[in-house]
């Protein structure tokens, strides 16, 4: 993976071990896309902020994720795939944007911590460290690796 070159060992090996695990083990894989040509050239909101179409797709993914969880179905968002690879394998037209590649499947239980947090990849940030009130502060959250 191209992005693995940016990571030093021993984290690189851990990163590469995540790559295909969910894709191969899940019951179903879903590629969620956004087609900016749908609904015509004028869509309220999208003319002033073009990204709102993609934001709406992300909200739909979140809603699907929450609905799946209530049914005992786990969802994993695979973010270490190349969009170009997805386009080629799934024959996605150039104007359509792959937004999410999801792995879904029944799970025995939901863990109390996300897998990446459990494995030490990244810690969970405190809510107070990522919410700003009234203005953007200069201090960025401290991420400990």
Spans of features found by a protein language model:
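Glycine/small-residue-rich phosphate/adenosyl-binding loop
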Residues: 1-57
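Solvent-exposed alpha-helices and their adjacent loops that cap or buttress functional pockets
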Residues: 21-24, 92-94, 123
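Structural motif
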Residues: 27-29, 75, 97-101
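Small-aliphatic-rich amphipathic alpha-helix that forms the alpha element of a beta-alpha
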Residues: 30, 38-89
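C-terminal helix-cap and adjacent tail motif
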Residues: 101-145
């Amino acid at each position: 993976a191209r992005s693995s070159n940016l990571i030093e060992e021993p984290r690189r090996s851990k990163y590469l071990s995540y790559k295909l695990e969910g894709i191969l083990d899940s019951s179903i894989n879903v590629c969620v896309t956004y087609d900016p040509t749908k609904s015509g050239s004028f869509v309220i909101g999208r003319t002033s902020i073009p990204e709102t179409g993609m934001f709406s797709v992300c909200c739909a993914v979140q809603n699907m994720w929450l609905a799946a969880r209530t049914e005992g179905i786990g969802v994993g968002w695979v973010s270490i795939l190349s969009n170009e690879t997805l386009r080629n394998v799934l024959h996605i037209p150039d104007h359509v944007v792959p937004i999410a590649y999801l792995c879904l499947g029944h799970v025995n239980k939901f863990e109390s911590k996300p897998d990446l947090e459990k494995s030490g990849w990244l810690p969970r940030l405190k809510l107070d460290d990522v919410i700003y009130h009234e203005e953007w502060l200069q201090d960025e959250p401290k991420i400990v690796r």
